[in-house]
Every structure is written in C-alpha cells, then in structure tokens.
A protein has these predicted regions:
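Nucleotidyltransferase catalytic core that binds NTPs
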Residues: 1-166
Length: 166
C-alpha cells in the first residue's frame, strides 16, 4: 500500500503522476491519499476540508487504485507516525510512504520522524530544484540512505503552494 499524505490544497496532477508512478515502479496494489485537516507546517488551508476531498476525487477520476481518505477522526491525530502505526496493525500490508524531495528537506522536523523511517518504506520523488537540497538535508545525512528510495521523476513541476498563488 502506498500512502500519500498531505493537505492537498489543492490536489493537482503532480499528486496523480507520482501515485501512478509508484504503482507502476513498485507494484503497489493501491495508493491512499490521506488528507489532513491542517498541515502543521502551513499557516492555514485556503480551502475547506470538504472542498479539498472533493478536489482530490475529481483529480483521481477513474483511477480506481487511488482512495481518498480522512483518518484523523479515526486515529485521533494528524501525525504521520500515528497513521503509519494504524496501517501497520494489519501486518499483511507493506507500507510505502510517498513524498516529494521538498518534504525530505524538512522531514527531520516531523513528529517522530526517525520512527516513521523505521516503520515503512519511504519513496522520495525528485522535484525540480530539490534533489541537491534533499541529498544535503539533515534527514538524509542522519539516517541511512537505504531508508529512502529516490525516484527520478521530472514529469510535473508544480506544487499546491504555486497553484494557490495563481
């Protein structure tokens, strides 16, 4: 199972592209877009949770291998480690956490980031302008590189924050 967590504010074709690539390259059965009510590293979402969920469903359209889910009420947390622990209760699934190289740069600021890297595979999708920063990041230097699988990927050069500025 692949998990792409985020605020999806808004969801865009980059999210879809890395989901498709993860399924193709790593033979994943499905990808879960685990949407958060509030990203702890952002001030405020510009769209409501319901609007973001609706936007995600619109982007994925007929891609049945992607599910849009909101787990925070179920797990009583917006922390990635708690989501990973929730999925690890069912030991038959191998967990792959998907992130862009921009997230690896600040991954060491995430709650229990070392535990996250121990409990799942982390697929880091290259993003224009971030490869060097991510390879020089505290996270990458602190943890063994085998904790991360870098995916060379240059199909989409867009971010939700760029879209909000438009």
């Amino acid at each position: 199972i692949g998990i792409l967590g985020g605020s999806f504010d808004p969801a865009h074709n980059g999210h879809l592209a890395i989901s498709k690539e993860a399924v193709k390259r790593f033979k994943l059965e499905k990808i879960i877009w685990a949407i958060t009510k509030k990203n702890p590293f952002k001030i405020k979402s510009s769209l409501s949770l319901q609007s973001r969920i609706k936007g995600c469903k619109k982007i994925i359209k007929k891609n049945k291998f992607i599910e849009v889910k909101f787990y925070e009420n179920k797990i009583k947390s917006n922390k990635t480690i708690n989501l990973i622990n929730y999925f690890n209760k069912n030991k038959k699934n191998e967990i792959f956490f998907l992130m862009g190289a921009d997230n690896l740069v600040n991954f060491h600021k995430w709650h229990k980031w070392k535990q996250i890297s121990e409990k799942c595979n982390i697929l880091v999708f290259d993003r224009y302008g971030y490869k060097k920063k991510s390879l020089n990041s505290k996270t990458y230097k602190t943890l063994k590189s085998e904790k991360f699988k870098f995916v060379n990927f240059n199909k989409v050069n867009i971010s939700s924050s760029q879209l909000r500025k438009i």
